[in-house]
């Protein structure tokens, strides 16, 4: 399927190179894209070539590139994008995760969950914000971090993503809330009901995400 999609776009990459790159990239899912590390793992090709491969898979809608949110805060911000596979079935296949029970306890389980939420946010944004919002992540060298930030132009909404039925947030979460002056912040987790963390932050079940987005 992937090979056919690329051929339809007029892109010809040797099959061995294609699958090797995707397998390597799968281990960066949900993490900062590191072109230099991938270049070494691919046998010494240039980071520029690795970045070009990533752009090809983004254009083919196989991979999503989430850019960092830049605001003039006088802080040192992370500048590399994060990468997510749009099809988690493909991601799991590349990671040799065959069944749901294989995912439990897997080192990539949390990143898989993060990808599920990010993909859902991206898909639902147009319904909740009239197509005018943009999706980013936020991270500073000092440790402030938010997995996803929706900027509508009139407000910013933050989302921290935790694969835990008893999620806890760190100081970095609260620092990000302050840095970005978020109107609301949610910790999206596999929980059955929501509960407040503050007057502007709450833990949110994944199943409630669509309703929350449509209310903004």
At which residue positions do the language-model features occur?
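Accessory nucleic acid-recognition modules appended to NTPase machines
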Residues: 1-154
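Structural signal for conserved beta-strand scaffold positions within catalytic alpha/beta enzyme cores
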Residues: 65, 85, 137, 160, ...
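Conserved beta-strand segments of alpha/beta enzyme cores
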Residues: 134, 184, 200-202
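Active-site-adjacent loop/helix micro-motif of nuclease/hydrolase catalytic cores
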Residues: 165-173
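Short, conserved loop/helix-junction motifs that constitute active-site signature segments
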Residues: 177-180
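Short, hydrophobic beta-strand segments that form beta-sheet elements in well-ordered domains
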Residues: 182-189
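Domain-level recognition of nuclease-like catalytic cores that cleave nucleotide substrates
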Residues: 191-216
């Amino acid at each position: 399927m992937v090979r056919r999609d690329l051929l339809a776009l007029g892109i010809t990459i040797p099959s061995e190179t294609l699958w090797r790159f995707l397998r390597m990239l799968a281990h960066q899912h949900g993490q900062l894209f590191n072109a230099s590390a991938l270049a070494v793992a691919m046998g010494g090709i240039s980071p520029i070539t690795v970045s070009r491969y990533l752009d090809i898979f983004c254009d083919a809608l196989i991979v999503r590139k989430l850019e960092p949110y830049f605001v003039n805060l006088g802080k040192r911000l992370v500048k590399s994008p994060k990468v997510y596979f749009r099809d988690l079935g493909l991601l799991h296949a590349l990671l040799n995760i065959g069944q749901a029970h294989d995912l439990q306890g897997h080192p990539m389980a949390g990143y898989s969950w993060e990808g599920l939420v990010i993909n859902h946010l991206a898909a639902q944004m147009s319904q909740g914000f009239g197509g005018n919002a943009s999706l980013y992540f936020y991270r500073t060298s000092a440790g402030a971090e938010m997995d996803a930030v929706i900027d509508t132009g009139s407000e910013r909404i933050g989302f921290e993503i935790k694969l835990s039925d008893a999620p806890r947030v760190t100081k970095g979460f609260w620092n990000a809330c302050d840095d970005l002056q978020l109107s609301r912040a949610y910790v999206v987790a596999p929980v059955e009901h929501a509960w407040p963390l503050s007057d502007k932050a709450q833990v949110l079940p994944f199943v409630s995400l669509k309703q929350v987005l449509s209310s903004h």
